[in-house]
Amino acid sequence: MFTREITAKDVKATEKNRIRYSSKHIKHLPPGTITEFEWKDYCPLGFRLIQELEDINHDEYMKSICNDETLRKLSTSKVGNMFLLSKDDRFLIKILRKSEIKVILEMLPGYFRHIHKYRSTLLSKNYGAHSVKPIGGVKTYFVVMSNILQSDVFMNKVYDLKGSSQGRTNKKIKVRDKTILKDIDLDFCFYVDSLARHRLIKQTKLDCELLEDEGIMDYSLMLGLQVKGSCHGSIDELIPVYDSFTSRGSVDSNSSKFMKTASNSPDRSSSTMYSCTPSRNSVDSENSVNIQSVASISPSPAQTNASDSPYESLVSKTNLTNIFQNSSSTNFGMKIPGRARRVGRGESGSVVGKQSREGGEEWYDVILYLGIIDIFQDYGVRKRLEHCYKSIQHSSKTISAVHPKMYSSRFQDFVSQIFLPDEDPSH
């Protein structure tokens, strides 16, 4: 419930806690495991307001991010090298520099006003900024965000897109064994309902205007691509749904032999974090973690909410109008139906249709999941120096390190180029 704005006093506030494993829990840990940490929350009240706005229970949030597996990974990882996912896929954790945490905090009042005013924003939700320090160790800063790609279906491809090209190819970055592809790897353009595209372009503009005003650049469009009727494997191994020489009917995903529910997905059984349940009455209970020696946390079985069909809640074209005209919708960017067209690059860099082996263009019925992530980089000294260095070697139009105004304009142009209106009356 939105009750007030985030103030400058809120932004400066911090809370410190000490996390200490119980004696019984230590017995179950490998030798040499760090068992005591200093934990710090930044702008705790401000982030609580965001959690309330997004219907995030604070106790469940803390149980998801504060467990021995997460603490171990956070205290041994380097900046930018890793994403951590909660077992229920709700939260995405990224390690940041101290300067990036500062940027998040400084923009928090304006960011909060924006996500409250525009409930269909594409911006990832920042639920908390924290630091953790093993006793005698090095402090690690991190942010907890919404997982834009949270889904009960397998993603055939996942992209991190900036609208630039220099250095924008896959560097084997993975989230839960899924390779994150980049701009150079993108060989599709997407056709979506014209109303959906209009809403997408409009919301992207509003979100980019906020980021531009806050001096933010180097953000990305996270895009998940799920082919209807497929299960696991690469989209490159699939037969196109239709091409220019076949009838343009869509595949019946419910009858496809490839259909499989998420509960049977081996990819989702290997998680980087696990959820926990509290036991405040038993501080030294087995497998507990003590926060200020008051609250203890113990592992609980993972919850599975997979339906019989991953497409039961798929947005159909008959109700697209209601969805995209409702400015209070918080699910915009999730489960957008469309068609993916395989494309290549012409000599001038323009997008051209790519021929399949049978001679027609490759098309796929897809579900799209998208949002804007990494909204914590300002155009400071480090990025200005990067711009000077790279612009000597490459065109400034192709590099990521550019002024926020130029970055915003290029990003919006890129989104409008890869998402096109689907005006095919037969689809």
UniProtKB/Swiss-Prot annotation:
Sequence segments annotated as region (Disordered): 247-287, 334-355
> Any one Gene Ontology biological process term?
phosphatidylinositol metabolic process
Name the EC number(s): 2.7.1.68
Where do the PIPK domain residues begin and end?
1-419
Instruction: Give the catalytic activity.
Output: a 1,2-diacyl-sn-glycero-3-phospho-(1D-myo-inositol 4-phosphate) + ATP = a 1,2-diacyl-sn-glycero-3-phospho-(1D-myo-inositol-4,5-bisphosphate) + ADP + H(+)
Ranges where the record places region Activation loop: 379-400
GO molecular function annotations of the record = 1-phosphatidylinositol-4-phosphate 5-kinase activity; ATP binding
| Stated name of the protein | Phosphatidylinositol 4-phosphate 5-kinase 10
